[in-house]
């Protein structure tokens, strides 16, 4: 499953409809089963009460959580989360990060996350890769990469972003 910084929800569909479209069309799931699964996922992301709302009636954080539920509706083994908080108002970033924390703890889902949320990456990751100019400069467990980076470019980046916070 993939979720990007732009939510890419279908604007003419409700949150529920956004979550059932692919399972019905791609997986051949029955509508009732897809709706039941979608409601469970909307509950997981804290949006059951918004199931009948179109994306234009949802905040950015709510749209992103619908996008996460929609991706999960396909029952992926791996989730790619690409800068999922970068387009959000800073006050709602926590809503989305809390959903990811829950997925990480309770659902044992493998996630590959591209983020500039260094504190979150350190907290939630089993392994961290530092990319620069399209190449992996350094990788390892978060304790090692954040606590004792070996590469000068990694040190420079972490110093800049961690000191800014």
Go through the PLM ranges and name each one.
Residues 139, 143-165:
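C-terminal boundary and immediately downstream tail of ABC-type ATPase nucleotide-binding domains
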